[in-house]
Amino acid sequence: LVFRVMKINQNGFREYDARWLFEKDIDLEGITDLGKGLGTQIIKHTKKTNPRVIVGQDYRSYSEKIKKALTEGLVSTGCNVEDVGLALSPMVYFAQFNLNSDAIAMVTASHNENGWTGVKMGIKKGLTHAPEEMSELKEITLNQKFTTGKGSHKNIDDFKKIYIEDLVSKNKINKKIKAVVACGNGTAGIFAPEILRGIGCEVIELDCELDWT
């Protein structure tokens, strides 16, 4: 018997993003192919040889290495990747405006339980992939119709601070509010309490320490 290890399950391409069980439905090589597919798509739509792409990741134990594999794929097509690190999805969307980049890719499986991974993607500012873009990405990736180029990677240090300062500066409350902030030991734990205190809330933290277990 010959067993074929599926490195990228086509069912992971959904209408508005992509989700897989890591290692069962997709491996790191599959993630790199996804990066190549996305990079090819971004270059096609922006008509740029070296488009700038913001990447970030959530706080799952394996998200950093998935982001690294995705980045390898993006860079191989010619994309210049700018990495904001540990992030919330809205922070990555904000970064596209703030840094005036061409596209975004956020490694996250949102509310899905541990074991899942995925990517939220967008090219036009403020818009994530819709069914048409997801269908195109699936076709490029599964058929390996990849562009090749020479891209780059750099880290954007302390972007979390820029994001929080922007939110706090634009939002202040006059009425004293006491807020219990329960973050389930997820990524929001290093954002929500600080932001709410910054706009004037009294915050009681519950499970705000990062813990991927």
Q: For each predicted feature, which ranges?
A:
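Gly/Ser/Thr-enriched, mixed-charge loops and adjacent short helices
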Residues: 117-213
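Short, Lys/Arg-enriched N-terminal segments with co-localized hydrophobic residues
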Residues: 1-5
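Ferredoxin-reductase
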Residues: 47-125
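An N-terminal, well-structured beta->alpha segment
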Residues: 6-72, 76-77, 156-177
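Active-site flanking residues adjacent to catalytic metal/cofactor-binding acidic residues
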Residues: 16, 57, 107, 181-184, ...
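Residue-level "edge-of-site" marker
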Residues: 26, 87, 109, 208-209
